[in-house]
A protein has these predicted regions:
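Acyl-thioester C-C bond-transforming condensing/cleaving domain
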Residues: 1-7, 19-52, 65-69, 76-172
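Short polar catalytic/cofactor-binding loops
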Residues: 12-17
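Short glycine-rich phosphate-binding loop at a beta-alpha junction
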Residues: 51-59
Length: 172
């Protein structure tokens, strides 16, 4: 039986944060931003042969429109001469970190040696809720499901209250 091995992050990069709908990147496709991030990460590891990359896992909260049709596969197809497989993961605000965790797990259990993982999102191209929100009303018919509708702001307030973290402590 193969032993669980360690997984390492050998390069990390990100694009600058823009303002939704009116920022510098408002007309830049999210797959193009992702390609720039991937290429920047590759520059940090010049000895890594792109052919060694086995798969890409990219998190995306709203994988539709300009960030649809499997943004992981599209971006790696644009970034590399040789095709790299890809899968897009949706866990809303935790999509990117979930993608990284999934890639690390594949390495840890010996399913892969080299992975690309991260997140991509353009709130200018695909707004909150997607281009055509159509929420199932049955989800909100039960009181215990109300948390599904919480945004990160409300979630942060509840966590801060639960753990008694004041605004002043957060800003310090």
């Amino acid at each position: 039986m193969k032993q669980v091995q360690d997984a390492y992050i050998v390069a990390a990069t990100r694009t600058p944060i823009g303002r939704s709908g009116r920022g510098f990147f408002r007309n830049t496709r999210p797959d193009e931003l992702l390609v720039a991030a991937i290429k920047s990460a590759m520059l940090q590891v010049p000895t890594l042969d792109p052919k060694a990359i086995e798969d890409a896992i990219i998190g995306c909260s709203f994988p539709e429109g300009e960030q649809g049709i499997n943004i992981a596969r599209i971006a790696t197809g644009l970034a590399f001469a040789n095709p790299v497989g890809g899968v897009t993961v949706n866990r809303f605000c935790a999509s990117g970190v979930t993608a990284i965790q999934m890639a690390a797990d594949r390495i840890r259990v010996g399913e892969a040696d080299v992975m690309i993982a991260g997140g991509a999102e353009s709130m200018s191209m695909v707004p909150m809720g997607g281009n055509k929100p159509s929420f199932n009303p049955e989800v909100f018919a039960r009181d215990e499901n109300v948390g599904i509708a919480y945004g990160m702001g409300l979630t942060a307030e509840k966590v801060a209250t639960q753990w008694k973290v004041s605004r002043e402590d957060q800003d310090a």
